[in-house]
Amino acid sequence: MSARDSILARIREALRAGGARHLPESEDQPSDRVTGVRRVLPKVPNDFSGQVALFAERSEVLKTEFLPCSDESAASAQLKIVSDREKWESVALPADDRIRTLLSTLAVAKLEVSRSTAKTDLEKVSAGITGCDALIAQTGSVLLTAQSAGGRALSVLPVHHVVIATSAQLVADLPAAFEVLEHKYAPNFPSFMTFITGPSRTGDIERVLVLGAHGPRKLTVILIGGEGTSAGDGTSKVM
């Protein structure tokens, strides 16, 4: 009997044996496993100041620059500080009046993104400035859609991504973020929705972590209405 015939014979024998083979039952019930997963994530405070503090802590771990500001004037001033520090020469922004106003004091070239904007032009700017749909305190993530980010490319192609958020957009966790999407867009959801958790990270086979290989190397989140409510000195800065 050839090796092939031997293998086929063993398969036929196994099939003739029939009968369902049950895997041993796990001692952990599904609800126990869910509880175990939840223990991995930090507990989210119920109050706004506690959630800002948690977002700041997660940002520090993720190497996100988090800048809480008292109002739009302070946010505009922070943008100028970041621009001067990073030596921005140009920025790209969506067609958004609030973002236009915040950037009005910057003495840099401004590219307002439209459907006709070339991707190569976005790759050349110093920073891409977008809004967002939500900030997630528990994970330090930013929720974006094509609508809030001015399309798909503005949050991906520039080397530095800057997110402008308001205090009303800070939510506790991922389920709350999905509720935001449901209430804001259902049933006509945007074609692009994403969670951004820190700058772009790529790990190779040798476990070498590289920032910015497949997306922005730097991520800055400016929270308007969040000053004085985060941990420490009120900011989480990663230069």
Task: Show which residues each predicted segment covers.
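The feature marks the mature, well-folded catalytic cores of soluble enzymes
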Residues: 1-239
